[in-house]
Structures are given as C-alpha cells and as structure tokens.
Curated annotation (Swiss-Prot):
Name by which UniProt lists this protein: Ureidoacrylate amidohydrolase RutB
Family according to the record: Belongs to the isochorismatase family. RutB subfamily.
EC number(s) recorded for this UniProt protein: 3.5.1.110
InterPro entries the UniProt entry points to: Isochorismatase-like_dom, Isochorismatase-like_hydrls, Isochorismatase-like_sf, RutB
Reaction catalysed by this enzyme: (Z)-3-ureidoacrylate + H2O + H(+) = (Z)-3-aminoacrylate + NH4(+) + CO2; (Z)-3-ureidoacrylate + H2O = (Z)-3-aminoacrylate + carbamate + H(+); (Z)-2-methylureidoacrylate + H2O + H(+) = (Z)-2-methylaminoacrylate + NH4(+) + CO2
Enzyme superclass (EC): hydrolase
Reported function: Hydrolyzes ureidoacrylate to form aminoacrylate and carbamate. The carbamate hydrolyzes spontaneously, thereby releasing one of the nitrogen atoms of the pyrimidine ring as ammonia and one of its carbon atoms as CO2.
Molecular function GO terms recorded: hydrolase activity, acting on carbon-nitrogen (but not peptide) bonds, in linear amides
Entry-linked CDD domains: cysteine_hydrolases
Keywords: Hydrolase
Keyword Hydrolase assigned: yes
Protein source organism: Azorhizobium caulinodans (strain ATCC 43989 / DSM 5975 / JCM 20966 / LMG 6465 / NBRC 14845 / NCIMB 13405 / ORS 571)
NCBIfam families recorded: RutB
Positions annotated as active site in the UniProt record: 22 (proton acceptor), 131, 164 (nucleophile)
Length: 227
C-alpha cells in the first residue's frame, strides 16, 4: 500500500512503472533550454537527487523504470511549422527564433541539450521513450509498452510538473491508468504557485500525490518480482 493523497493506493510491483519525465540537460542543467529561456531551474538539483533515490528503490524492488526524452530531429520537422500550435507555444522554438545563433541546439536529438543528465543515466533494463510533445502518450510507443507489460500504475517524477508531467498524467487518467505524482521529485517551469496548482489538480481531479520517502518505504516492503 502506497501512502498518498487523497487516500492510499494499492500498487503491485508488476503493475507499476516509475516514469522519469524529461530529465534532460534542457530542463535541469545550467545553459540548457529552460535556463536560457529565463526559467528558474534552481530546484532541478534537488529533483535530480530525489529522482535518483526513486529509481534506485524502483530497480531494487523490480519496478519498471521508463525515461522520457522530449525533443525533435535537428531540422525541427517533428516540431511542426507555423500550422502547428507547438510552433507558436514551444518556448524552445520561440527562444531559437529570438536568438538564431541557438538554432539546432535546443532539444535537438543527438545534442547536449537533448541528452539525459549524467546523474540519471538509464541502466540495463530501463526503457527510454522519445516524445515530440508535452504528453508522453502522443505519437509515442508509451501506451503499447505499458499494455504489453500489464502496467496500470504510473509513478511520475521529473520536470516540468505543470507541463510534461501533468500532461502525461492527465492523458493516462483518460486511458485508465492510475497516476501517482511524487511531489518532491518534480520541479515546475514557472513560479512556485504553478507547482502548487499542478499538485492540486492531480490530487483533486486526476490522480494521487505521494513522496519519495513513502514510495521507498512502500516498495521496500514488497518482495522483488522473480525473473
């Protein structure tokens, strides 16, 4: 049983995955896209440490670990042109239009910005899922990966709470997945109030909210699944 708000949730190891959302240099490192675009990334360091604890506990318990990587091809065809809302709303794309010297650097596959941070390198058995939009369910193999493994419970951590994390958790709700947000293993893009708003939305409408400590305790009590 995982302690959570608004109530505890029963989670079986074989039906659970930890979903690490967009822990890339773009979102968590100085000189990455969010930093260049003017967002406060000071909370990213704590999030990295908390996520490292989470995935360590997950692997020890036999819980599937899935990483998202957000971005596009180096020519940004996958990002969409002026006919796409993403072209207008993506702060990475807007930043590159304002600063043409950055063209081809932000969230481009194969580049430093796109890469996962060194502290959270995937391990053997982990799954990495590329995604081209905020929600990890859109135009990706994520749903198929989950259904093939019988996974129903998604434990979310990563950046940004109010954008890609919440977008994916919401879509999961509509696809009948149980979404759990580890509030102390996330960081928002924007002021502190958007973090609180995202947590409120999850707890009240779309899922459950827990902590890294509660996750670690809950899964330490569950024997690892056998191969």
């Amino acid at each position: 049983m995982l302690p959570a708000r608004p109530e505890p949730l029963s989670v079986a190891v074989e039906e659970t995955a930890v979903v690490v959302v967009d822990m890339q240099n773009a979102y968590a490192s100085p000189g990455g896209y969010l930093d260049i675009a003017g967002f406060d990334i000071s909370g990213a360091k704590a999030a990295i440490s908390a996520i490292a604890e989470t995935v360590e506990a997950a692997r020890a318990a036999g819980v599937t670990v899935i990483y998202f990587q957000n971005g596009w091809d180096k020519d940004y065809v996958e990002a969409g042109g002026p006919g796409s809302p993403n072209w207008h709303k993506s702060n990475a794309l807007k930043t590159m239009r304002k600063k043409p010297e950055l063209q081809g650097q932000l969230l481009a596959k194969g580049g430093w910005d796109y890469a996962l941070v060194d502290q959270l390198a995937p391990q053997p058995g982990d799954i990495v899922v590329p995604k081209p939009r905020y929600s990890g369910f859109f135009n990706s193999q994520f749903d198929s990966i989950l259904r093939a493994r019988g996974i129903r419970n998604l434990v979310f951590c990563g950046i940004a709470t109010n954008v890609c994390v919440e977008s994916t958790l919401r879509d999961g709700f509509h696809l009948e997945y149980f979404g759990i947000l580890l509030e102390d293993a996330t960081h928002q893009a924007g002021p502190e109030y958007v973090q609180k708003a995202a947590i409120y939305n999850v707890e009240t409408f779309f899922g459950w909210v827990s902590t890294v400590a509660d996750f670690r305790r809950a899964f330490a009590q569950i024997p690892p699944k056998e191969d």
